[in-house]
Amino acid sequence: MPIQVLPPQLANQIAAGEVVERPASVVKELVENSLDAGATRIDIDIERGGAKLIRIRDNGCGIKKDELALALARHATSKIASLDDLEAIISLGFRGEALASISSVSRLTLTSRTAEQQEAWQAYAEGRDMNVTVKPAAHPVGTTLEVLDLFYNTPARRKFLRTEKTEFNHIDEIIRRIALARFDVTINLSHNGKIVRQYRAVPEGGQKERRLGAICGTAFLEQALAIEWQHGDLTLRGWVADPNHTTPALAEIQYCYVNGRMMRDRLINHAIRQACEDKLGADQQPAFVLYLEIDPHQVDVNVHPAKHEVRFHQSRLVHDFIYQGVLSVLQQQLETPLPLDDEPQPAPRSIPENRVAAGRNHFAEPAAREPVAPRYTPAPASGSRPAAPWPNAQPGYQKQQGEVYRQLLQTPAPMQKLKAPEPQEPALAANSQSFGRVLTIVHSDCALLERDGNISLLALPVAERWLRQVQLTPGEAPVCAQPLLIPLRLKVSGEEKSALEKAQSALAELGIDFQSDAQHVTIRAVPLPLRQQNLQILIPELIGYLAKQSVFEPGNIAQWIARNLMSEHAQWSMAQAITLLADVERLCPQLVKTPPGGLLQSVDLHPAIKALKDE
């Protein structure tokens, strides 16, 4: 088949595979467009879980007649125009592909009117070339998008839709998340002609706890501790539930936003859990609704097809900032619940200095020379839209990072000479659920950790190996097999073929599927941790190992595979280390309580401190 340019409709349908996963994905993209248009009221009508109809009506600025056709074209957007705009995104949408992708897998109609126009115009795309037809229509200022018969022309995608109830529950969850992000917008959601959700806009300065309680429940509201934390270009606002009263139902409430964009970020979750670890049980999770605001130049939102994840340029600073903010609130132990009425409430008590409120940092204390001037300033209420799109944001932020981070972690100067601490073996507490805070990377593959004033070194390759072993070891159900795009065919000896046949059931539990004939074996599927490995080398070595065994236990095979996997990281970064430890603490909590040999080594600072004191 010769190389050729794909037809526009087919190209859009391929793009829709990433953008449009299910009806909830359509709702998310369209509602975010309404918010970017400045809408203060959004009405969402759903029929049959979104498979039949999705209608989004807003009172935003609208789209001009001359731009309606462009709105349905690929890579057409009003939100960015240059690389500089892409590196400092403040809008929710920016790629200009959502409407084109949605219209290629549904019957989409776009009706809009601007305040300057006397009449509205309606546009829709059809045919193989996605030609856009524009005609006059009746419509107030704003935009209405109707998506009919989602996936009508892609039966393979349509058959993967779940039940009507399940799909609507996903839509409902998306609306809940958006309603928590924008308290200033009225949002109405109806299903099959019945109003299901009504979130009224909260006036500026009004009580946002009513909407918080409507979405997260009264139980969360009663245990919620308000956070207002600011340092430099970083601001953290929101609520975190008191860990002492967290229940399994509350633990499902985990909403995080970065510059108003809903996120699922492991670095942020790890920082929050680390701050709550002393008060949470082994099987408990923190409950929170948090809003992080950061200079847009310091965060990359263009790293995930559905924009569910971000990448921070200064991940260490962000992680420790969130950790200190949550920890300070928990240490204050506010006992008064959030108000349930509209009576004026006293202003929250200001926090004089980040580091003091969060407790002493024993690691930074020897370097402290003088107190740091308070830098906390009151900030607007959580969840509100930024007043200005970072007019003073400059790329020079990185040059200031060292000074900002030093001030964030510095402690006031001691009033009297400190005595050198007695030597002791730093050990993790029996009820600890965290290795501690990552300070830096040493010798490219070791993480320097701090916990309760104790310093230790953790071997990242060893932690990665233990994590892979847990991921490969089957539990109550076999490990999920990932089919290979191109099956691997290898020549084997009679002895190796016999060993493979004996180990077939054990390998199947590990997610390894193969088929053998006279002199060859064809590997058809492997578990996820093996997908990025060089299978041309690993599989023959695995076959050689199995040929020497007489008993085939899945656990032993998983252990051998984990020891022989090549690491994906030759040079570890702070973000990679924090992500790895978050996964290890979640999947391998026993390693935190009883670290095996070669994983964790305590560092005794006593000789160095004593040498400094004796000088």
Swiss-Prot record:
One example GO MF annotation: ATP-dependent DNA damage sensor activity
UniProt-listed InterPro entries: DNA_mismatch_repair_CS, DNA_mismatch_repair_MutL, DNA_mismatch_S5_2-like, HATPase_C_sf, MutL/Mlh/PMS, MutL/Mlh/Pms-like, MutL_C, MutL_C_dimsub
Matches recorded under Gene3D superfamilies: 3.30.230.10, Histidine kinase-like ATPase, C-terminal domain, MutL, C-terminal domain, dimerisation subdomain, MutL, C-terminal domain, regulatory subdomain
Keyword DNA repair: yes
GO biological-process terms attached to the record: mismatch repair
Keyword Repeat: no
Swiss-Prot/TrEMBL keywords: DNA damage, DNA repair
A Pfam family hit: DNA_mis_repair
Residue ranges of the region described as Disordered: 363-397
Comp. bias intervals (Low complexity): 364-391
A GO term from the CC aspect: mismatch repair complex
Family indicated by similarity: Belongs to the DNA mismatch repair MutL/HexB family.
Known function: This protein is involved in the repair of mismatches in DNA. It is required for dam-dependent methyl-directed DNA mismatch repair. May act as a 'molecular matchmaker', a protein that promotes the formation of a stable complex between two or more DNA-binding proteins in an ATP-dependent manner without itself being part of a final effector complex.
Protein name: DNA mismatch repair protein MutL
Organism of provenance: Shigella boydii serotype 18 (strain CDC 3083-94 / BS512)
